[in-house]
A protein has these predicted regions:
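Extended, folded domain segments that form the structural surfaces/walls around functional sites
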Residues: 38, 57-60
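Phosphate-binding/switch loop-helix module in NTP-utilizing enzymes
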Residues: 118-122
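Conserved G/P- and acidic residue-centered "switch" motifs that form tight phosphate/ATP-binding loops
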Residues: 35
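ATP/NTP-dependent adenylation/nucleotidyl-transfer catalytic domains that generate, transfer
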Residues: 2-30, 43-53, 60-61, 72, ...
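Short, surface-exposed alpha-helical segments at coil->helix boundaries
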Residues: 38, 42, 66-70
Length: 246
């Protein structure tokens, strides 16, 4: 599938899904991080001509990450009249959360809590606007290595780009003319004070992960399987205790 065709296909899929719902939503609600995935997803959503609400939700965010988020919001609004943007600073809410749970302090847990707080915010905004929450995860993250927060950025209503590889996301970004500084930025989940990028957390770049997913003979295939095994619980349905003979 060519890049433009892929964009149109995703756009039409979003429209068809909304029409298939018992009550068609009035809006599409998306969290904007300043990264390529959320930038591409929000731009494709805007192409549907439905009302699109994009949220920037900084929590102890690095200035450069937050700047990219705001720049994309402005770019999006300059291109599409159906886009609304909001800055919802969650710093104080998160600080209160950290204080309340100081007896249970855990760095990794608090990092994931940032994503879960953003998810809660997205759903509140969606509820107030008869909207649905649109996910921004790609195929490598969502179905390859499970690189997302359980019930955080993984908690969405639809996942339009979850069957697209990271390389395809970058191609769509270029086709959509997403800002160059976003296309060139190092991918990061934005959950850590030190601004660590995705590659440093995964131990591989997205290009290496894609190759490992597609080629069992690649040098990183074993490492890919190890990461996948660790995170498989995120990608599987919640285990249910089935009663015998019932």
């Amino acid at each position: 599938m060519q890049t433009k065709e892929r964009i149109d296909y995703i756009k039409n899929w979003i429209c068809d899904y909304c029409k298939s719902m018992p009550k068609e939503p009035d809006s599409l609600v998306i969290g904007i991080s300043g990264g390529i995935d959320s930038s591409v997803t929000s731009a494709i959503c805007a192409l549907t001509e439905k009302k699109v609400i994009v949220l920037s939700m900084p929590i102890k965010q690095l200035k450069e990450q937050h700047k990219l988020s705001l720049q994309h919001q402005e770019w999006l609004k300059s291109k599409f009249k159906n886009v609304q943007s909001h800055l919802i600073n969650l710093d104080e809410v998160f600080k209160s959360f950290e204080v309340s749970l100081s007896a249970f302090s855990n760095e990794h847990g608090f990092a994931n809590s940032r994503a879960r707080l953003r998810m809660t915010t997205l759903y509140q905004v969606a509820a107030a606007n008869n909207g649905i929450v649109v996910g921004t995860g790609n195929k490598v993250e969502d179905f390859g290595v499970g690189f997302y927060t359980k019930y955080g950025d993984g908690g969405v209503d639809i996942s339009p780009i979850a069957d697209c590889k990271k390389s395809q996301i970058w191609q769509m970004g270029k086709e959509l003319k997403i800002l160059q500084n976003i296309i060139k930025a190092q991918p990061t989940d934005g959950l850590w004070d030190d601004g660590r990028d995705d590659a440093s957390q995964l131990g591989m770049s997205y290009q290496e992960l894609e190759l490992a997913m597609e080629d069992k003979n690649s040098e990183n295939y074993k490492k890919y399987l190890e990461i996948r095994k660790r995170n498989l619980h995120k990608m599987k349905p919640v285990p249910v205790c089935k009663m015998k003979n019932e």
